[in-house]
Regions:
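Collagenous Gly-X-Y triple-helix signature in extracellular proteins
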Residues: 2-159
């Protein structure tokens, strides 16, 4: 899960460096004048994208069960004394794998990497022993990408 944290102390951490904050370990992916893009070093939980079906918007991250979970993480961090301003807004472009923009852009303080973000930072991302979600929706309900076993990077099957 990706997060943006605003902190002057992260200026000393190089991109790809691991640091501890909020009781968890993170990897610094990038920084600019607004703050740092960081990724949790470990998977925090395993969960489905959605319980049940959503025929209207099957790929919409905003309607997934992941976003309430991430919102609860943010609430827990702030309840434990971390100022909300520590988490600067992250704009997630939900352009799908075919370039369609039907889901638009939305802003969160804790979110997921997109497929493009993964492509940009993959060398810095620690290896984990389980699959994890990206924010990018697949382009059509008639073709569903998946990764499987240890020999697929991306498999697209048609109906």
């Amino acid at each position: 899960m990706s997060k943006i944290l605003k902190s002057v102390t992260l200026g000393d951490v190089k991109n790809g460096g691991i640091f501890r904050a909020l009781g968890k370990e993170f990897v610094k992916l990038d920084a600019d004048e607004h703050g740092c893009l960081v990724l949790a070093k470990e998977i925090w939980t395993r969960m489905p994208f959605r319980e049940g079906d959503d025929p209207e918007c099957p790929n919409d991250l905003r309607r997934s069960e992941i976003m309430p979970y991430l919102g609860n993480c943010l609430a827990e961090f702030t309840k434990n004394g971390t100022p909300l301003s520590t988490f600067i807004p992250l704009r997630i472009d939900l352009q799908d794998t075919t370039g369609q923009n039907e889901y638009g852009i939305f802003e969160v303080r804790i979110g997921l990497l997109t497929l493009r973000g993964y492509g940009k930072y993959w060398r810095l991302i620690p290896k984990v022993d389980a699959p994890w979600w990206l924010a990018t929706p697949y382009g059509t309900p008639n073709c569903s990408p998946r990764t499987d076993n240890d020999y697929y990077v991306w498999s697209v099957n048609t109906d």
